[in-house]
Every structure is written in C-alpha cells, then in structure tokens.
Amino acid sequence: MNNIHTPVMATEMLSYLAPVDNETYLDCTFGTGGYSKLILSNCNCKIIAFDRDPAVISIASQFYQQYSNRFTFFNDNFVEANKYLSKSAKLNGIVMDLGVSSMQLDAANRGFSFRYDAELDMRMSQKGYKASELVNEASEHQLADIIYKFGEENKANKIAKHIVLAREKKPITTTLQLANIIREAVGYNNYYKKNKIDSATKTFQAIRIFINDELSAIQNFLNQSLELLAVNGRLIVVSFHALEDAIVKKFMHQNAVKKVAQSKYSTNKQLPLQNGVLHLLTKKIAVPTRTEIINNPRSRSARLRAALKINE
C-alpha cells in the first residue's frame, strides 16, 4: 500500500474517534485509505468505506486482501450510505475528510489543478457534467453566481464576464486556459499580494464544488448521521474551507445538548439540559500543529470538529 498518502490531522482524528476492538466505523471519504488504514491498524475493528471516485477501487482491493472481513468498500457518494447500511446495525463512529483529495489534485488528467495543463474535467465520480461544459454553456449570470457563492470570490462578476468573452473566440477546454483567463480578468500580482493565493484558486474551487454538488452532499449526509450513529458513537469531520466548516458547525451546534440558564439563587447545582443529541468534543475547532503544516503545507487550512452522540 505504497500509494497511501499521510492523512491530515491523523493524530487528532484518532484521539477524538478513540476506536476500540469489535466496533464498526464509517470512513465517508476513503481516498487513498489513510484514515481507514490508521483505524484498522489501531484496533481489531471493522471499517465501512465510501468513495465515489473509481480511481480508488484498486486501493480498496488491497485493503480487502490485507484486512479481509474487517473492511467493506462501496464505490459511491457517502450521501448514499443509507442505501447500503442496515438500519439495525448502528455505527460506533463516522469520519469525514472533506473536499478534493491529494490523489485527485496530483493526477494531472483529472483537471482539478491549474498546476498542470490538462482537460478541464473536475468530476470526482468521472461521470456527468464536466467543468469545461459548465464554463462554455452557463450564462454570465450563472457563472458569476457560482463563483461568488461557492468560491467566495468578490470579483466574480468580472471573472464571469471575461470567461464569456473568451469562449466566444475559442472554447475553454483546459485548466491553464481557464486559469489564464481568470488571471487576465483580475490580475495576478496585486491579487496575490492581497489574498496570498493565485487569482484562479477561488474560481477553481467554486467550479469543483458546483460540479460535484459537494455542499448539499455534506448537509444531507450530516442529517442522516444521527440515525446511523449508535449512542456513544462519534462524528469527526475535517473540512478545508469556510463553506464546509460553516455547514458542519451549524449542524453540530443545532443538535448539541445545551444547559438551561437558571437563577443565581437556585440550589440545584446541576443545570438542567435542553433536548439535544450531541455533546461537542471540540468547543472550538481543532487545527493542525505547526509541525504538520511545515511537513504538509496542504494541511494549513484543515479544521476538525468532533461530537459524541449521547442519546437517541
């Protein structure tokens, strides 16, 4: 299993998940198997893993060979978990490592990154609507809305206008072609000085999120997760940008047990609790250590939230 990447915030994930023998855990985003490998190596437990990317099937096959009946894999989006999992068999923990994987970013032919000149694809499942189809067919208004909503890009209108003008001359089919159109629209040097990122970064993020319907999948799965988890089961989510983290934060806080304020004259030392399902294990977000960021710069934007299900 030489192709397994070191997963982000591995120590923190294991600490909050606290896996033990004879329990079952769900890895929503298998990727190259980093989290699954850590959990399976930590104790004699079982893993059920999901990933919609067919490129990871060969890696999952290696896990079947090594872990036999301790490992089960489904080549599908984690939002479809309910279709595969028995309602009577509750999970003891769920881990989610959101966003695009290092494997996908590093595969030039997948079209996720403008570090390579490749076909503008960006599909995690390698099925359906390509990014090139979006940028060549969507209206200027639609493009601006997508770039602003999913990329939080303040210059969305300007970028959308330049994309439409460029495609009138020649179809936009490659990553570098699109990146250069964006850079021409908003500049590069001044944008980098102000934002510390390439001027194409936010637009590429926006298109990827839209193409793969990432945010609604996160929201829909989180809504399912309370039914899937057993009491004392743990939910661990690692996100990489504010849009993902906002969904996770809102979900956990909305479903958290809260203490009810009472009079300072009350003799009841233990505060009564409002209805809720989750106990927050992370009162604030957990972030990577400085050492991890130095060793793995891609971890710098990672944010981890964890919660414990304490009742049905």
UniProtKB/Swiss-Prot annotation:
Q: What is its EC number?
A: 2.1.1.199
Catalytic activity, per the record?
cytidine(1402) in 16S rRNA + S-adenosyl-L-methionine = N(4)-methylcytidine(1402) in 16S rRNA + S-adenosyl-L-homocysteine + H(+)
What InterPro entries would the database entry show? RsmH, SAM-dep_MeTrfase_MraW_recog, SAM-dependent_MTases_sf
Among the GO molecular function terms of this UniProt record, one is: rRNA (cytosine-N4-)-methyltransferase activity
Q: Name one GO cellular component term.
A: cytoplasm
Tell me which Gene Ontology terms the entry assigns under biological process.
rRNA base methylation
- What's the short name of a Pfam family annotated to this entry? Methyltransf_5
Gene3D superfamilies with a match to the protein in the record: Putative methyltransferase TM0872, insert domain, Vaccinia Virus protein VP39
Q: Cystine bridges: which residues?
A: none
The reply to whether Nucleotidyltransferase figures as a keyword in the UniProt entry is no
Subcellular localization is given as: Cytoplasm
Q: Where does S-adenosyl-L-methionine bind?
A: G33, G34, Y35, D51, F78, D97, Q104
Q: What class of enzyme is it?
A: transferase
Source domain of life is: Bacteria
Keywords linked to the UniProt accession = Cytoplasm, Methyltransferase, rRNA processing, S-adenosyl-L-methionine, Transferase
- Which coarse location class describes where this protein primarily resides? cytoplasm
UniProt keyword Transferase, yes or no? yes
The protein's job, in short, is: Specifically methylates the N4 position of cytidine in position 1402 (C1402) of 16S rRNA.
**What PANTHER family does its record include?**
12S RRNA N4-METHYLCYTIDINE METHYLTRANSFERASE (PTHR11265:SF0), S-ADENOSYL-METHYLTRANSFERASE MRAW (PTHR11265)
Family the entry assigns: Belongs to the methyltransferase superfamily. RsmH family.
User: What is this protein identified as?
Assistant: Ribosomal RNA small subunit methyltransferase H
Cite the source lineage.
Bacteria, Pseudomonadati, Pseudomonadota, Alphaproteobacteria, Rickettsiales
Q: Which gene encodes it?
A: rsmH
